Amino acid sequence: MSGNTLGTLFCVTNFGESHGPAIGCVVDGCPPGLPLEAADIQAELDRRRPGTSRHVTQRQEADQVEILSGVYEGVTTGTPIGLLIRNTDARSKDYSNIADTFRPGHADFAYWRKYGVRDPRGGGRSSARLTAPTVAAGAIAKKWLAGQFGVRVRGYMSQLGPIAIPFSSWDDVPGNAFYAPNAAVVPELEAYMDQLRRDGDSVGARIEVVAEGLPAGWGEPIYDRLDADIAHAMMGLNAVKGVSLGAGFESIAQRGSEHGDEITPEGFASNHAGGVLGGISTGQPITVSLAIKPTSSIRVERRSVNRAGEPVMVQTLGRHDPCVGIRATPIAEALLALVLIDHALRQRAQCGG
């Protein structure tokens, strides 16, 4: 199966399945000399870890990362960094009833038509479980970007289902399970999710990710544009159905006199461009919005077919996130950091900066 590697100079190859012995990644191209220990990576993994609240899957995975290579005496050596996360709480029997059927909205049908075989246990390769190695690699990227350029990447949830979450403060984000930037809205979110779980259904979300502190000049023209690579990476996150930068789809209703960010001696007067013009960073914060669809694995019965093409009713049992957007924030942060470190290294290679 191809398509498992992200990046040009800072490359991350992801491997494993949801119910296999382990998942992990190989990070190739990390500069040498970066102080790195497992605790640096674990802090990010713990933000994404399942079973941390009643609003996410109750699968209990410690997600303890093992650094297999590429680090010696606490610093990176410049050689490939092998990261391993063992699966310890898989319950494959929960999927025996859907081994020969296709769940509506899931990757089951598409995988089977492409490969002629699929692993139904927890979604196999298409499971959101495979985002853990992405977060692990992103932790390395975050640390390097912060140390070299002072770049900070962070995110939050701006909408859960029909509930908009007005931004209040970054300080509110780590204090709740939703990564909501407004503590006053959290009780409403909790009540909504409690009812959703009782209904056996799921819902989507909107996530915002912001990168601050990067210089102008990162990115490439035409095919390797910085914004194109960001969109490419974000669409690799399970359940993402839309990506926009800056004003995004609101640009449709704007006039050019409003949308074009005016430039003053002090800098840009606005940031409708989301920090990227012509595929290259402007030095403004990069702002990315993600639309995340409802989880496909739900207890509500839906119509489908089996491998013989016969009509069936599908009900997915097991442990699932009723809203995958709740745990998506640290994953989206990791993906943005991975794209940025790759372009930082490309800029250094081409222009020396």
From Swiss-Prot:
Superkingdom classification of source: Bacteria
Transmembrane region(s): none
Binding site residues for NADP(+): R48, R54
InterPro entries: Chorismate_synth, Chorismate_synth_AroC_sf, Chorismate_synthase_CS
Binding sites annotated in the UniProt record for FMN: R125, S126, S127, N238, A239, G278, K293, P294, T295, S296, S297, R319
Family: Belongs to the chorismate synthase family.
Matching HAMAP family: Chorismate_synth
Protein name: Chorismate synthase
